[in-house]
């Protein structure tokens, strides 16, 4: 067995190597093509979608269906798209009950467009396709988002189309035929007059989460196969000063575009520590604009200028932890008052402390808690009893970890006959479902302690999963 002792610096992100970088004034500058640095795959896909040789007028993008993401995509498309000199669409001449369509002479015609990029989160039929209104015998035609995006790009949330299938069927027909036909939204109430169709050409970017994209693929398998696909990457792997610079510029850009203060040189270390808590990995930092914006919105009241320093960030994080910390404090009180029994001194046979990640539904913060695992061994037929599983409190992944641990022990003992003992393991004072395999190393140690009749030091806690060869594996959330 190899034992490697970790210093406290091994458990925190490396920020000392980038102190000179944090002090550079370039981090506060606006960078025109910030998306190409942090989202190169997405940037390339958008270029492909805008190309006249694109394989499909539709693009599927995996990203949260939030206004902030749609706005970011819209801004990126406007940067990539050359300014259009042509005018698309036209205008309708209405004389009594006669309506005629004429190509646009100028951009301010009612149904004229200049190839703009339009974003939409949730829309209804009238917002998307426009409508015909009649009042006191006078007819007016109202343009919709598709008319405003004529010659350009429509960025729309996928869930609004999945929830309203008729909207999708009509939008698909418009884009495929490059023509807009006026039809009644209610079949029982036809249009009072006939309205001539108009040419309409646009590209559509459908933005959705993984589940929405899966539902769309089931509904439109052929279109999903032909459409350009890309993803908004949630995080950035930090491997050198260049990637750290890209992340810092992304954070600064996100803050300034929302008119929020951005980090001062000494604040980056505090922000990065909070960022790795969010991602769960030391070398991975989030690109989620909602998370970034939240940090600066909360610290903004404490800032006096256009930047926020380390002291202000630390104060904001301490206030947030206190505000959200009621449940964590109550759990700690239960241990201190010995309502939950956790031994931190001495030695015990068949008992060990593990670490659990507690998540309460509706609570924004996950927190750690020590868990007491016990193992009892007795003469038997080789059965390993997982009490959590027997009581239907153990999940499938936890059961898998138990079976892997059992397989390792069988292989290690190399007995020529059936094991002459049975063992039972449990999480003591656990009254809710337990899942995950990150306790399998602690369970294995408790089992070996009980088998060998060797006590375990109770001042330590163990976490980590184990494979069939007995090797410790990394776990998240630390």
Model-derived features: positions:
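Flexible glycine/proline-rich, aromatic-decorated loop/lid segments
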Residues: 220-226
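Terminal-proximal interaction/regulatory segments of ATP-powered molecular machines
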Residues: 358-478
